[in-house]
């Protein structure tokens, strides 16, 4: 946000980030795609290595997936579009909201299940107040449900009930979108925005389609494409699980440490 105080804060943070980059022996980023498009990371290209993040979810409690489906009328209100994020402008909630009329035209019983903090989000009250009148209409009609924050076990019951997960983020504060991998591990395709890094899970694993940043019509088109032909977006879940397995990721860090130790001799 504009203002003298925020300018001072940004200057201090930029200085600290630059010192960290200069003094570090090496920098790890989740994807080369994000690094290449980052004004900060691209300055340190010679000391960058991309390593995917570890991702794992607990198993759902016995009967939890079915209980979730019954409680939220998943069989009657399909397809189910999931979003797992804070209610914030940068997360692109408004883009999904603007896409809903186009989605409902094709699928009149579609619903959005929103997992994540949505009330009293710091700095987002004006955004919340502006969008909520429209969202409340969808809530009344059974097209939108908020859950608030869910713990990992609850998320393990959330994902299997989705037909698609969307990550319509708008700026580079989103570097990857780990929730996409959690969804894919449950066989759920994703529709992210084309932000560097955020587009990589779908690009790498083929489970979904990338939508233009901030474009509600393209987001709707991408979601509809995935919903219309889900078999087309089935991925190799075993391979995906292996790529993000904590032990596999740890091995990549061990290789990096070995290279750095050898280089330092």
Question: In which residue ranges do the predicted regions lie?
Answer:
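A short, active-site helix/loop in glycosyltransferases that binds the activated sugar's phosphate group
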Residues: 10, 14, 18-50, 55-59
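A short helix/loop element that forms part of the nucleotide-sugar donor recognition site in Leloir-type
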Residues: 60-74
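Conserved donor-binding/catalytic core segment of Leloir-type glycosyltransferases
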Residues: 74-91, 97-100, 113
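A charged, aromatic-enriched C-terminal amphipathic alpha-helix characteristic of glycosyltransferases
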Residues: 231-262
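Conserved acidic donor-binding segment of nucleotide-sugar-dependent glycosyltransferases
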Residues: 204-216, 224-230
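Nucleotide-activated donor-binding/catalytic signature segment of Leloir-type glycosyltransferases, i.e.
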Residues: 125-153
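Acidic donor-binding loop of glycosyltransferase active sites
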Residues: 160-174, 188
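Short alpha-helical donor nucleotide-sugar binding micro-motif in glycosyltransferases
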Residues: 149-150, 157-162
């Amino acid at each position: 946000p504009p203002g003298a105080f925020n300018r001072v804060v940004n200057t201090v943070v930029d200085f600290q980030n630059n010192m960290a980059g200069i003094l570090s022996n090496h920098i790890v980023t989740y994807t080369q795609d994000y690094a290449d498009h980052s004004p900060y990371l691209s300055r340190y290209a010679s000391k960058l290595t991309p390593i995917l993040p570890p991702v794992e979810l607990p198993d759902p409690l016995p009967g939890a997936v079915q209980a979730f489906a019954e409680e939220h009328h998943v069989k009657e209100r399909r397809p189910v579009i999931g979003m797992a994020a804070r209610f914030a402008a940068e997360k692109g909630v408004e883009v999904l909201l603007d896409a809903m009329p186009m989605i409902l035209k094709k699928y009149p019983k579609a619903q959005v299940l929103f997992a994540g903090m949505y009330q009293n989000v710091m700095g987002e009250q004006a955004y919340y107040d502006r969008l909520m009148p429209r969202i409340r209409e969808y809530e009344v009609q059974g097209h939108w449900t908020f859950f608030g924050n869910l713990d990992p076990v609850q998320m393990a019951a959330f994902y299997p009930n989705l037909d698609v997960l969307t990550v319509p983020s708008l700026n580079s504060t989103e570097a990857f979108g780990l929730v996409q991998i959690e969804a894919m591990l449950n066989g759920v395709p994703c529709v992210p925005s084309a932000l560097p890094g955020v587009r990589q899970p779908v690009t790498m694993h083929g489970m979904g389609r990338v939508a233009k940043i901030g474009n509600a019509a393209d987001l709707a088109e991408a979601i509809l494409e995935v919903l219309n032909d889900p078999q087309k977006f089935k991925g190799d879940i075993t391979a995906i699980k292996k790529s993000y397995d904590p032990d596999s990721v740890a091995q990549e860090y061990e290789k990096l440490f070995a290279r750095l130790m050898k280089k330092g001799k």
